[in-house]
């Protein structure tokens, strides 16, 4: 397959960064005037990730129709997506208003609520304990009907009710839960299986409104999801995988929302996902067998994502740089969620990824041995501290053995005294 050869050549030459920069320079740039209005500042998660004016979703509100979301229409593929940022606490109602007004049936979430100690998205759907949430600002109620937790994703069945008309609709919430922080999955297998589960639900069909896709900024992982889906759809329609140019498709999508695909690594992963998906479409038995294994959805996580070991139980007072965490408010220990321009997005993610890789690689067996030695040393030190009883018994023992300690010294003194006295007496007798 031509695309696979292209991938291998780029990989061998290490040209992903250069190709990514070319895409960035060729990408369209359109005005975002509405997003920059002062009244909309608190509706943007990142100050420099904004929807273009010509493709932004407009809410049916008289006072303010703004939401940080873009409609992406891929004509040949006959596919439409709404890409949006992770909802903020003050925009959760707007998010569900958009879902209602656009008649969307599915929501795809590609991030976790908390990542790297930073809040990436508000909790905009009810959890098991709550069962329902009411959004008074938009007159909507959301109820959790069921939750199906798989090894690398979760599917939630939600009911969205318009409190004014009492009309209800079923919404499917597809939550991919194993995308590594500041990186990409090692293998596209589980990601593609997740994509095909979304397809099978009918949420992407023309019978419904555009599917809503989000991560944190709504451009990186979200762009990867939509790019892979569109390319695979075009391959299937054309019956010629080699005719699909991923770079060209991405540039077309960037006409509707800025910054889709944030890093060179995400671009590389998109190629991998499309190549793997194309093999499945073309009937590659090895790929199909692998996907059958994933489809069993047993309790074991796929090999590409093994979670870190559980953290030890939290101590009452945990020192941090000479301070105790519990003496400070919790927000002081969470990095501030800000984001500069698209360059800084990529740089920040790249730095975090490289530092994460460095920290993982530096966790050598020697490090673990040293940690255990330090722990053992502390335990030994604690064990060697005598108790009060031990101290008192030791003192008594010293008192009991006092004569035995001084006896040799006293004997020597007495002997020396006797010898000196004898010598003196001999001297007196002999010479006087």
Curated annotation (Swiss-Prot):
SMART domains: PTPc, PTPc_motif. It is a peripheral membrane protein. The modification N-acetylmethionine is found at residue 1. Most abundant in testis. Also found in kidney, spleen, muscle, liver, heart and brain. Residues 3-277 form the Tyrosine-protein phosphatase domain. The gene is Ptpn1. It catalyses: O-phospho-L-tyrosyl-[protein] + H2O = L-tyrosyl-[protein] + phosphate. The modification S-nitrosocysteine is found at residue 215. Residues 354-364 have a biased composition (Low complexity). InterPro entries: NR_tyrosine_phosphatase, Prot-tyrosine_phosphatase-like, PTP_cat, Ptpn1/Ptpn2, Tyr_Pase_AS, Tyr_Pase_cat, Tyr_Pase_dom. This is Tyrosine-protein phosphatase non-receptor type 1. Residues 297-322, 335-399 are annotated as: Disordered. Belongs to the protein-tyrosine phosphatase family. Non-receptor class 1 subfamily. The modification Phosphoserine is found at residues 50, 242-243, 335, 362, 364. Ser-50 is the major site of phosphorylation as compared to Ser-242 and Ser-243. Activated by phosphorylation at Ser-50. Keywords: Acetylation, Endoplasmic reticulum, Hydrolase, Membrane, Phosphoprotein, Protein phosphatase, S-nitrosylation. GO terms for cellular component: cytoplasm; cytoplasmic side of endoplasmic reticulum membrane; cytosol; early endosome; endoplasmic reticulum; endosome lumen; glutamatergic synapse; mitochondrial crista. GO terms for molecular function: ephrin receptor binding; insulin receptor binding; protein phosphatase 2A binding; protein tyrosine phosphatase activity; receptor tyrosine kinase binding; zinc ion binding. It is found in: Endoplasmic reticulum membrane. It comes from Mus musculus (Mouse).
